């Protein structure tokens, strides 16, 4: 029970990032930089309390991972601007699960048992259908919101997903294969946050207006850090499968938050579509967690 309660923290912390950042305001460049600065402050505090040993390999992996993460987060913030948080969030999370899962299976042979392949591919099919419903619009009475551009949103979502997936592969697979380096979240978080700041500056082409939005979004970076700490604690208390499952449920928080707190408009049909999409997404994520537990 304790592990489940701990897992609820990253669910709400990470799930709230999209709509909290958009509530604070600013463009994607300001949101990303603010978030990374907040993450750096959080990581520095953790480092000073824990004082882990940092080798050059760990620092390099963390820095590159942070750079890739920043690309992913910048793209995600942009996709939210163009499609809305309630649409972009499930599409982003789901695409990461599917593409990351497929690469893990075919490139790194993470599934070895027949039951893993059966449940895994069912999960991915469920996720794909969930994508469809999450983005589906009411053909008879579509709500037109100013600033929406699904083409630009999907483009941003594409490079966002690539950034996130490569970052996860680097940490989970390539760090061991290339450098034979093992690390935990509390050790890697500081060098990663340095890479995150550099990545945010690169994505902003070093031309980011240091307005109030940047400083407000530092709170979002702290939320990200808190989610990481509790994710680690939940995995220790309840196992990786439970922690992973609950972390993916954050999509419920972000979707509902986008509608309730950002006033994203939906017709009754679209609300039904979103509900179906969420149920399918959660089902697919839980199935993938079961697949992980079978390994």
From Swiss-Prot:
UniProt membrane topology term:
Multi-pass membrane protein
SUPFAM superfamilies xrefs: Multidrug resistance efflux transporter EmrE
Spell out the disulfide connections: none
Which residue ranges run through the membrane? 4-26, 33-50, 54-72, 85-107, 117-135, 156-178, 188-206, 213-235, 241-263, 270-291
GO CC annotation terms, alphabetical: plasma membrane
Instruction: List UniProt keywords, sorted A-Z.
Output: Cell membrane, Membrane, Sugar transport, Transmembrane, Transmembrane helix, Transport
Q: Where in the cell is it found?
A: Cell membrane
Signal sequence annotation: none
Q: What is its main location?
A: membrane
* A GO molecular-function descriptor: carbohydrate transmembrane transporter activity
Q: Which family does it belong to?
A: Belongs to the GRP transporter (TC 2.A.7.5) family.
Protein name (database record):
Putative sugar uptake protein YxfA
Task: Give the lineage.
Answer: Bacteria, Bacillati, Bacillota, Bacilli, Lactobacillales
Gene designation per UniProt: yxfA
